[in-house]
Amino acid sequence: MAASAWLEAGLARVLFYPTLLYTVFRGRVRGPAHRDWYHRIDHTVLLGALPLKNMTRRLVLDENVRGVITMNEEYETRFLCNTSKEWKKAGVEQLRLSTVDMTGVPTLANLHKGVQFALKYQALGQCVYVHCKAGRSRSATMVAAYLIQVHNWSPEEAIEAIAKIRSHISIRPSQLEVLKEFHKEITARAAKN
């Protein structure tokens, strides 16, 4: 791993709890500073922040969540979220696609894995909760890929559609680039068929 990658990963770890507290604060405060913990993007996908253990029942019973796509690294979910076994016990399958916080970009392969996972649950009429720490960047990139696949939208159209529902998403230029690659692959595949 390059020195810059080590620094980025270290910075993400140092800032994890302060930025998580900020996310919790924004979820609890009332008024214009309030941010909902999660949003329903369509009939299948919910985009949100860490699914804390106390949210499990609501996600499963009220939102019909049967799949969870975790874009976090292991240390981010260790104490506050369900383990894969705990999700399974609740009737939920977890797919972890670890991506470094703040600077990380989901890989093209992981975007494809995540989209296929969501499509599996879409076919079953069930829902998938896609999350990272705050539900703003890593997970929003994954949801954009899903929308690109489902609607044959451009990356910009997918991001705009998400932002209309969850206005505080933040897709960085490097994440937009991987979405453009994803779109190019999806478009090329569709042209062959």
Swiss-Prot record:
One of its GO terms (molecular function) is protein serine/threonine phosphatase activity. Disruption phenotype: Mice die prior to E8.5. It comes from the Eukaryota. One of its GO terms (biological process) is regulation of intrinsic apoptotic signaling pathway. PROSITE patterns: TYR_PHOSPHATASE_1 (PS00383), TYR_PHOSPHATASE_2 (PS50056), TYR_PHOSPHATASE_DUAL (PS50054). Residues 1-31 form a transit peptide. Keywords: Hydrolase, Lipid biosynthesis, Lipid metabolism, Membrane, Mitochondrion, Mitochondrion inner membrane, Phospholipid biosynthesis, Phospholipid metabolism, Protein phosphatase, Transit peptide. Pathway: Phospholipid metabolism; phosphatidylglycerol biosynthesis; phosphatidylglycerol from CDP-diacylglycerol: step 2/2. It is found in: Mitochondrion inner membrane. Its EC number is 3.1.3.27, 3.1.3.16, 3.1.3.48. It is a peripheral membrane protein. Pfam families: DSPc. InterPro entries: Dual-sp_phosphatase_cat-dom, Prot-tyrosine_phosphatase-like, PTPMT1, PTPMT1-like, Tyr_Pase_AS, Tyr_Pase_dom, TYR_PHOSPHATASE_DUAL_dom. The active site is at 132 (phosphocysteine intermediate). The keyword Acyltransferase does not apply. One of its GO terms (cellular component) is mitochondrial inner membrane. The modification N6-succinyllysine is found at residue 85. It catalyses: a 1,2-diacyl-sn-glycero-3-phospho-(1'-sn-glycero-3'-phosphate) + H2O = a 1,2-diacyl-sn-glycero-3-phospho-(1'-sn-glycerol) + phosphate; O-phospho-L-tyrosyl-[protein] + H2O = L-tyrosyl-[protein] + phosphate; O-phospho-L-seryl-[protein] + H2O = L-seryl-[protein] + phosphate; O-phospho-L-threonyl-[protein] + H2O = L-threonyl-[protein] + phosphate. Predominantly expressed in testis. Expressed at lower level in heart, brain, spleen, lung, liver, skeletal muscle, kidney, bone marrow, eye, lymph node, smooth muscle, prostate, thymus, stomach and uterus. Interacts with STYXL1; the interaction inhibits PTPMT1 catalytic activity. Lipid phosphatase which dephosphorylates phosphatidylglycerophosphate (PGP) to phosphatidylglycerol (PG). PGP is an essential intermediate in the biosynthetic pathway of cardiolipin, a mitochondrial-specific phospholipid regulating the membrane integrity and activities of the organelle. Has also been shown to display phosphatase activity toward phosphoprotein substrates, specifically mediates dephosphorylation of mitochondrial proteins, thereby playing an essential role in ATP production. Belongs to the protein-tyrosine phosphatase family. Non-receptor class dual specificity subfamily. This is Phosphatidylglycerophosphatase and protein-tyrosine phosphatase 1. It comes from Mus musculus.
